A protein has these predicted regions:
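Active-site loop segments of alpha/beta catalytic cores
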Residues: 1-29, 35-40, 50, 61, ...
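Short active-site-proximal "capping" loops at secondary-structure junctions
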Residues: 26-30, 69-72
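Segments that shape or occlude catalytic/ligand-binding pockets
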Residues: 40-69
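Short, glycine/charge-rich beta-strand/loop segments that flank catalytic centers
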Residues: 65-75, 138-145
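A contiguous, low-structure linker/loop signature
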Residues: 69-111, 132-133
Length: 284
């Protein structure tokens, strides 16, 4: 079986030769070809070379267009890139440091906005070069993560209490953008869209259920309607929201090393495909 066939067989409940291997590789992939991570994160040509080389070297079953956030800089966020560490949002100059700016924020077009368009180019190239052998995965930011990129993570955490109506309006914007961007990635060649929502593990179960879950569900449903399989990735401990995650109906749910796989299985149910939960420091 090819890697693509292996992943799709698993998701469709069909026989397969062995479980697929589909880790998230970003800085690791850049390292494999000697590229600076800051370049990998903004240049689809470097990303494609790194993804293909890494997948073929280690026998991974997918290639992914995941880099740093592409939506935020195209919405005016001040993003700092580094050679050998992940990006950072300049919260002192957050694009939505003033809440009034949300009403003036224009929805960028993924087909022409510089950063999102670069990812589309990368996915099209991945599809052309290895799309028959490897599953091609795109990526969008989830509502909590995307909102934090625009507002600043610390400010957003206060907004949940100080101005919940603003949070809902902001989530409306970022989810609409996520669906639009995800649809464009499917058209470019992605068969699966990952949803990265790391900040969702920081808000606690009450706020997650009130604010985050409904918008994650809308995003997942929108990506499914676009023809994509959906993979949810929430970093950190999701122990207290696992049952809610199981109700999102994602095709794959990533399980971080902070969450026992047995607990994830118990809470999400017997049919949910789970991916993880290797500790990249201790185990690797």
């Amino acid at each position: 079986m090819t890697g693509r066939e292996r992943v799709l067989a698993l998701l469709d409940g069909l026989p397969l030769d062995h479980l697929p291997l589909m880790p998230i590789t970003m800085m690791f992939a850049a390292d494999q070809i000697g590229a600076k991570y800051g370049t990998y994160a903004v240049d689809h040509r470097v990303m494609v070379e790194a993804q293909i080389h890494t997948a073929e070297t280690f026998g991974f079953d997918q290639v992914s267009g995941i880099t740093e956030t592409r939506e935020a800089p195209d919405c005016g966020a001040a993003v700092r890139y580094f050679d050998d560490q992940p990006y950072a949002i300049d919260e002192q100059n957050a694009s939505l440091s003033s809440k009034a700016a949300l009403a003036e924020l224009k929805m960028p077009d993924p087909g022409s906005a510089r950063n999102m368009h670069d990812r589309l180019c990368g996915l099209a190239l991945l599809k052309a070069r290895v799309g028959r052998e490897k599953l091609v995965e795109g990526w969008v930011e989830g509502p909590c993560g995307a909102a934090a990129d625009l507002r600043g993570i610390n400010t957003l955490m206060l907004d949940f209490y100080d101005d919940p109506s603003f949070v809902l309006d902001l989530f409306e914007f970022v989810v609409a953008l996520g669906i639009q961007f995800g649809r464009a990635q499917v058209e470019a060649g992605a068969e699966m869209i990952g949803v990265g929502d790391p900040a969702a593990s920081l808000v606690g179960p009450i706020l997650y259920r009130q604010f985050v879950w409904p918008f994650e569900k809308r995003l997942v449903d929108g990506l499914h309607a676009a023809g994509a399989r959906v993979r949810l990735h929430i970093c950190g401990s999701t122990r207290r929201i696992l049952e809610d995650i199981g109700r999102l109906e994602c095709d794959i749910v990533d399980v971080d090393s902070a969450v026992p796989m047995s607990l994830a299985r118990e809470k999400t149910g017997p049919k949910q495909v789970l991916l993880g939960n290797l500790d990249p420091v201790r185990d690797l």
